Amino acid sequence: MSDADLPNDGGIKLVMAIIRPDKLADVKTALAEVGAPSLTVTNVSGRGSQPAKKSQWRGEEYTVDLHQKVKVECVVADTPAEDVADAIADAAHTGEKGDGKIFILPVENAIQVRTGKTGRDAV
């Protein structure tokens, strides 16, 4: 079997998504269903097309222009990255501004610290 016949053209891909925090449980379920249950989750804040919110605290008005989001990272070799991205997109979708973004990036190498395995074997 050639590399072109393997998922991700024989390489390793990082699927990184910035999503609403309340959609994390749905995304985790969707990832498990497509065979990519391993993930890293980080709380982040950022700004995109979602409008800023004006609030008051102790009589002072202020603008919140950085919104709380969750970054989900999933490294895959045997599961097609497009399938992972589609699963995240379907699970995180609300149709409103601020649903997030998904990026697919190549991974040059992976090393499993415990075993020393590298490349696809480490994923």
From Swiss-Prot:
<comment type="similarity">
    <text>Belongs to the P(II) protein family.</text>
</comment>
<keyword id="KW-0597">Phosphoprotein</keyword>
<feature type="binding site">
    <location>
        <begin position="98"/>
        <end position="101"/>
    </location>
    <ligand>
        <name>AMP</name>
    </ligand>
</feature>
<dbReference type="InterPro" id="IPR011322">
    <property type="entry name" value="N-reg_PII-like_a/b"/>
</dbReference>
<dbReference type="GO" id="GO:0006808">
    <property type="term" value="P:regulation of nitrogen utilization"/>
</dbReference>
<feature type="binding site">
    <location>
        <position position="49"/>
    </location>
    <ligand>
        <name>ATP</name>
    </ligand>
</feature>
<feature type="binding site">
    <location>
        <position position="114"/>
    </location>
    <ligand>
        <name>ATP</name>
    </ligand>
</feature>
<dbReference type="InterPro" id="IPR002187">
    <property type="entry name" value="N-reg_PII"/>
</dbReference>
<feature type="binding site">
    <location>
        <position position="49"/>
    </location>
    <ligand>
        <name>ADP</name>
    </ligand>
</feature>
<feature type="binding site">
    <location>
        <position position="75"/>
    </location>
    <ligand>
        <name>ATP</name>
    </ligand>
</feature>
<dbReference type="Pfam" id="PF00543">
    <property type="entry name" value="P-II"/>
</dbReference>
<dbReference type="GO" id="GO:0005524">
    <property type="term" value="F:ATP binding"/>
</dbReference>
<comment type="function">
    <text>Involved in the regulation of nitrogen metabolism. Regulates the activity of its targets by protein-protein interaction in response to the nitrogen status of the cell. Increases the activity of the glutamine synthetase 3 in the presence of 2-oxoglutarate. May regulate the activity of the ammonia channel Amt2 via direct interaction.</text>
</comment>
<dbReference type="GO" id="GO:0030234">
    <property type="term" value="F:enzyme regulator activity"/>
</dbReference>
<dbReference type="InterPro" id="IPR015867">
    <property type="entry name" value="N-reg_PII/ATP_PRibTrfase_C"/>
</dbReference>
<dbReference type="GO" id="GO:0005829">
    <property type="term" value="C:cytosol"/>
</dbReference>
<comment type="subunit">
    <text>Homotrimer. Interacts with the glutamine synthetase 3 (GS3) in the presence of 2-oxoglutarate. Interacts in vitro with Amt1 after ammonium shock. May also interact with Amt2.</text>
</comment>
<feature type="modified residue" description="O-UMP-tyrosine">
    <location>
        <position position="62"/>
    </location>
</feature>
<dbReference type="InterPro" id="IPR017918">
    <property type="entry name" value="N-reg_PII_CS"/>
</dbReference>
<feature type="binding site">
    <location>
        <begin position="98"/>
        <end position="101"/>
    </location>
    <ligand>
        <name>ADP</name>
    </ligand>
</feature>
<feature type="binding site">
    <location>
        <begin position="38"/>
        <end position="40"/>
    </location>
    <ligand>
        <name>ATP</name>
    </ligand>
</feature>
<feature type="binding site">
    <location>
        <begin position="98"/>
        <end position="101"/>
    </location>
    <ligand>
        <name>ATP</name>
    </ligand>
</feature>
<keyword id="KW-0963">Cytoplasm</keyword>
<protein>
    <recommendedName>
        <fullName>Nitrogen regulatory protein GlnK2</fullName>
    </recommendedName>
</protein>
<keyword id="KW-0067">ATP-binding</keyword>
<keyword id="KW-0547">Nucleotide-binding</keyword>
